[in-house]
Amino acid sequence: MKSIFNLSKGILSVALISVAFASCSEDTMDNINKDKDHTTSVPAKFILADVITATAFSNIGGDFNTYYSTYVEHMVGVDNQLANAEKRNGEPSASSTFNNVWGNLYSTLKNARIAINISSNEVTGNYTTKGIGEVLAAINAGLIADSFGDTPFSQAALPELANGQPQFLTPELDKQEAIYTAIMEYLDAAITDLPKGDKSDEIGEYDFIYKGDGEAWLKLAYGLKARYTMRLLARSSSKDADLQKILEYVDKSYTSIEEQAAFSIYSATNLNPLFDFQWSRDGLAASKSYADKLIERNDPRLRRIFCIGQGKLTENENAVSIQVTGADDPRFLMADNGTAESVKYEYNTPIFVYS
């Protein structure tokens, strides 16, 4: 009997030890694939460097530029998907047309909101950095509202997660009007925060537009206030008062082109996305309807804003520098809106793509 009891004790001990080892092994396995070198939090200035780049390169400089320029007849699409867009052949209504920029906008807005939250710590007091985040949030929210109308906003691109997942997997649509209200709130907050400065960890060189100059960002904020007040004039209950506000905002904004919010870090190897697209594909041609308006009004810009197509140049000419001299120029060749042939390097090129 005693031997049976001892045997039972032995079996129980082995079982307990096995369970303990299994538990330890499970804990070890749970932690073995955790990347301990991957940071879980970063200063807001690093996040805003990405937000500024994404806003300029992907959101403002991306698909909106190319597609919208054909829809409003500033340019004519003559190649591939832009030729389809020009002829309204699937591209305007296809759900995939703006997939890339849609994802980029919401990702950028979320990152701007994260930077705002990080900078809101009263101990660190990074008010200028917070104000920059608020201006960038307003810009991206404006692109969303202008482009998509009623769309997810208050329940989308939120900085806080719920159990590692977005708080709202099927966010509700916000009215476009509500998004414009939020834009103004962001700008008002920025106007309050920007002049206060940063107590620590200034954004400095990570601000690729103004190098952390709060006064410059303040002028941008007032310029955006003027823009969106103008955009809402048709719905204004007091147009005269809003027109006066616009003048006041403009007075507090830029006084020269040198102050504009320019993302000027492009180079021969890091190309402006619109220029890169045109240079590699020649998918956009000069618009006949646009040129006709300039001719009708005897607008002198006709001699400044169109370049000769690359296929029409001589060996000694440079595509970027040879401008059309007017409607009587023998190489004046505009693309017909909606019916242009899908050919490259023939039509005149709008100078805007070389900016």
Give the positions of each predicted feature.
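Conserved, well-structured interaction surfaces
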Residues: 45, 80-151, 165-197, 342-354
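Membrane-proximal, proline-rich intrinsically disordered regions
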Residues: 24-81, 92, 96, 103-106, ...
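Aromatic-residue-lined binding/catalytic grooves and analogous aromatic/hydrophobic interfacial grooves
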Residues: 25-26, 150, 184-197, 214, ...
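Short coil/linker segments at helix-helix boundaries
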Residues: 147-185, 201-210, 235-249
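Sec-dependent bacterial lipoprotein signal peptides
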Residues: 1-22
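Hydrophobic-face positions in mid-chain alpha helices that act as interaction patches
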Residues: 240-355
